[in-house]
Curated annotation (Swiss-Prot):
An annotated GO cellular component: ciliary basal body
Domain of life: Eukaryota
Annotated stretches, region: Disordered: 1-21
Protein name as it appears in the record: Coiled-coil domain-containing protein 178
Keywords in alphabetical order: Coiled coil
InterPro entries linked to this entry: CCDC178
Coiled-coil segments on the chain, per record: 157-266, 292-403, 439-480, 514-539, 570-631, 665-705
Source taxonomy: Eukaryota, Metazoa, Chordata, Craniata, Vertebrata
Length: 866
């Protein structure tokens, strides 16, 4: 129903306002019409409630315990709005409430009009009765009192009852308005939830469209990567098999050659054993000799180490001595430099004192003349000062006057300045208030404009989202249809693949039986070949190991002999050269050592004397310093007191200067001599070190050369004899090996022919094996690819089934969720209907009160008319 719709059955009483005789009839008609309207509205609301309760009987029965009790209805008297057929399409009870308000306002206005009409008619009637009964008896005034009493008694009561009724109606209207606002908020929340649910459904549908193909594609890519890796792994294995076959061929060739050598060695095993025994005897003898030589070498080496340790200890001692001597020399040099500095300072002080004495004499002579001039000037200045004091007093008076005037002007200026700033502050405050108001207005205007823009943008975005959701739903339906078609195609394709897989499995079983038979044959051949190969390998390994060990030992013996001969020759030459050089140098060194010892003693004595002289000089310098200090103090005191003692002090200073000059010259000479002595000492020490090192080296070489030379001569004789015997043996062995080589070559040719024949047979068997193997691997690769494709399809089907199940569960849960939401909403609506019915009952009771009021009112007036 529209908001401002009015009932057509309501009469207008403004036309009959002047007719005073028909007031009671009009009031009766109004009562009847209002009663009919209320009965019609109650019947309609009861029909609505019965229809609603018939649809939801189960829920009403469940909720009747908590909502239909009297206490709950009283507590929720004005808390929920009323709803009618006009509000079923809209979830807000605003139109019904507005209609109720307008209806009550109309009733109130009509009641007021009727009251005014009744008062006017009552006054007219009283005036008419007064005019008619003016000439009657005394009993007439008693009758006139009754209508006035009715007016005074009934009108205030009626007014009070009307006021109470109107206050209740206003309270009801306000409660309905609050309930309407709460219903509006609930409806907004419901709409927002509905939007969120629709957005979630759209997002989930988009996710299904986007993520499912991506997931399937990722799984397909993963399986394709695994297939590629397996293929590459199989290719690597095939390459490794080929490489192993090539290695096998090479090893077979090497084994054939070794077999020939083994046969040859087996035929000549007796000679080889004899040769081995002879070589072992020779090796044992040489090892015994080697051990003896090594023991001698170790003893000599230990002696050499001891001598080297002694030399290093002596060197360390000499270094320590050298360091101590250098420290002492440096300390003496530092002391000498400090003495030189002190002498320089004393000479400077002497010169300063002489100059100061001369200047003081000159100043004293000049000061006597200056004093006379100063006395004259002081007299003139005293006169000038008196004049200046007078002028200063006058100026002070003038300055005080000017200061007083300045203070007066400053006070006036400060008062004017403070007034100006106070006015300025007031103006600034007013301007700031005006600017703040303007800013607040602009901010409010901008906020409202932004809110309007935001609302418009939200409306546009909502419309766009709705259009997009509609489009997406259409696209989703199309894609679901395409997915169903793809599913049908995939099912047909899977059936064909299952048939092909069955055929491939049958072929695979047949080929497998054939390959197993061939593998059994090949295994038997391999066992035969492996037994023969293992026997040959064992024989060849043992013989080769013994031959290699013998060869290694022979080569090691030859190398050691050659190295020992070279070292012996080199040492012999070196020792001969060293002996010749050392004998000449030893004699020279002994003479130089004696001379150096004598010089060292002289230098040590000289140093001792120098140190003593140095100590004496230090003492003299200290004494002179003390004397000079004492004299300087005395001279300062005497210079200030008297002038007569200047000559004595000057003479003493000149004597001290002469002494210091002499001492300074002596110190310079001593420092030069010390430097020369230090240089000579360093040179002698360096020479001593070099000579000592050479002496120790030569002494060591001289001690060991003779023993080594004798030992080497003996070894030389022994080695020459041994070399001569070994040359004979080697010549015999060479002749024997030449004869054996000829026999080996003949046997080698025969064995090569046999190897060629066996290799051809083996190659033919290997080619047959490789052909069968290639056919088997090709079939196996095909089977693997088919198995992988079948497993991929099975996994895809399983994933699709799982997805369908999950989507079914999801939609089932969504249906249950929506059902629960609807149940809650229906329960809330039932509660609201019950509360509306309670409100209607209260309104009907109010209307009945009003009707009772109207009934009572016209009955009294009619009785008076009668």
């Amino acid at each position: 129903m529209p908001e401002n719709e009015k009932e057509p059955a309501q009469p207008t009483t403004n036309e009959d306002a002047l007719d005073t005789g028909k007031t009671c009839l009009q009031i009766k008609e109004l009562k009847d019409k209002e009663r009919a309207l209320m009965l019609a509205e109650n019947a309609r609301m009861q029909g609505l409630s019965e229809f609603f309760f018939s649809r939801h009987e189960d829920k009403r029965l469940y909720e009747s315990k908590s909502t239909n009790t009297e206490d709950v209805n009283k507590a929720i008297y004005f808390s929920y709005p009323s709803r009618r057929h006009s509000c079923t399409l809209v979830n807000i009870p605003k139109p019904c409430v507005n209609k109720m308000i307008s209806h009550i306002e109309d009733v109130e206005s009509k009641i007021q009009e009727h009251l005014t009409q009744f008062e006017a008619s009552f006054e007219e009637w009283t005036s008419v009765t007064k005019d008619k009964e003016a000439g009657l008896d005394v009993s007439a005034p008693e009758k006139q009192v009754h209508p006035e009493k009715g007016k005074d008694e009934k009108c205030p009561e009626l007014k009070k009852r009307m006021e109470t009724l109107l206050s209740e109606a206003i309270h009801l209207i306000k409660s309905l308005e609050t309930d309407r606002a709460e219903a509006e908020q609930a409806l907004k929340q419901h709409k927002s939830r509905k939007k969120k649910i629709s957005m979630k459904i759209d997002s989930w549908s988009i996710w299904k469209l986007q993520e499912l193909p991506l997931a399937v594609q990722k799984e397909h890519e993963n399986f394709s990567k695994i297939n590629a890796e397996l293929r590459s792994y199989l290719e690597d294995i095939a390459l490794k098999v080929e490489q192993l076959q090539e290695r096998k061929e090479k090893l077979e060739k090497a084994n054939a050659k070794l077999q020939v050598d083994i046969d040859y060695m087996a035929s000549h095993s007796v000679l080889l054993e004899k040769k081995r025994k002879q070589e072992l005897g020779c090796l044992k003898e040489r090892y015994h000799k080697k051990f003896e030589v090594m023991e001698k070498f170790r003893a000599i080496h230990e002696e050499l180490k001891e001598s080297v340790d002694k030399c290093e200890g002596a060197k360390a001692r000499l270094k320590n001595m050298k360091v101590e001597n250098e420290r002492e020399i440096q300390e003496e040099l530092i002391n000498a430099t400090s003495y030189e500095k002190e002498l320089d300072k004393l000479s400077v002080l002497d010169a300063h004192y002489t100059t100061s004495i001369e200047t003081v004499n000159l100043d004293i002579e000049g000061d006597e003349e200056a004093m006379n001039e100063v006395l004259r000037e002081t007299q003139s200045t005293t006169n000038e000062l008196e004049n200046l004091k007078k002028t200063v007093d006058d100026l002070k008076r003038l300055f005080d006057q000017y200061c007083w005037r300045q203070r007066k002007y400053e006070n006036e200026y400060l008062e004017a300045f403070s007034n100006f700033y106070s006015l300025k502050k007031t103006w600034d405050i007013e301007l700031s208030n005006v600017s703040k108001d303007a800013k607040d207005l602009t901010i409010v205007y901008e906020a409202q404009s932004e809110e309007n823009k935001r609302i418009q943008s939200e409306i546009q975005s909502i419309t766009d989202d709705i259009e997009e959701s509609i489009k997406k739903t259409a696209e989703m339906e199309e894609e679901v249809h395409t997915f169903v078609e793809m599913k049908m195609k995939n099912n047909n394709y899977l059936k064909q693949l299952y048939k092909q897989a069955y055929q491939v499995g049958a072929v695979y079983h047949l080929s497998r039986h054939k390959t197993e038979e061939l593998e059994d044959k090949l295994a038997d051949l391999k066992r035969i070949f492996k037994g023969r190969e293992e026997l040959l390998k064992k024989l060849t390994r043992g013989d080769i190991a013994t031959g290699i060990e013998i060869q290694k030992r022979l080569y090691a013996i030859e190398e050691t002999q050659f190295i020992e001969m070279q070292e012996f020759i080199r040492r012999q030459v070196l020792y001969n050269m060293a002996l010749l050089e050392v004998e000449e140098q030893l004699k020279e060194l002994e003479a130089e050592a004696v001379r150096i010892r004598y010089l060292h003693r002289q230098h040590s004595k000289m140093l001792h004397n120098i140190r003593k002289r140095k100590e004496r000089v230090k003492k003299n310098v200290d004494a002179t310093k003390k004397k000079l200090l004492k004299k300087s103090k005395k001279s300062r005191m005497e210079l200030t007191r008297t002038e007569g003692k200047r000559s004595i002090i000057h003479e003493e200073i000149e004597i001290a200067r002469g002494q210091t000059v002499a001492l300074h010259e002596k110190c310079i000479e001593l420092s030069k001599e010390i430097r020369i002595m230090n240089l000579e000492r360093t040179n002698y020490e360096e020479r001593l070190k070099k000579l000592q090192e050479e002496f120790f080296k030569l002494q060591f070489d001289r001690e060991h050369v003779h023993g080594v030379y004798d030992h080497l001569m003996r070894e030389k004789q022994y080695c020459e004899e041994r070399i001569f015997e070994e040359e004979r043996r080697f010549r015999r062995l060479i002749d024997m090996r030449k004869n054996t080589l000829k026999n080996i070559r003949k046997c080698q040719d025969d064995l090569l022919e046999e190897n060629l024949r066996l290799a051809k047979e083996y190659q033919s068997a290997q080619l047959i094996f490789l052909k069968e193997k290639e056919s088997y691997f090709n079939g196996y690769d095909r089977l693997l690819s088919l198995n992988f494709s079948l497993s991929d399809k099975k996994k895809l089907c399983q994933l699709q089934k799982r997805l369908d199940q999950k989507w079914q569960e999801y939609f089932r849960l969504m249906i249950l969720f929506n059902k629960t939401k609807l149940a809650k909403f229906q329960g809330d609506s039932q509660n609201s209907i019950q509360k509306i019915l309670a409100v209607q009952e209260e309104s009907s009771s109010l209307m009945q009160h009003i009707l009772d009021f109207f009934k009572s009112f016209p009955n009294s007036s009619c009785g008076e008319d009668d």
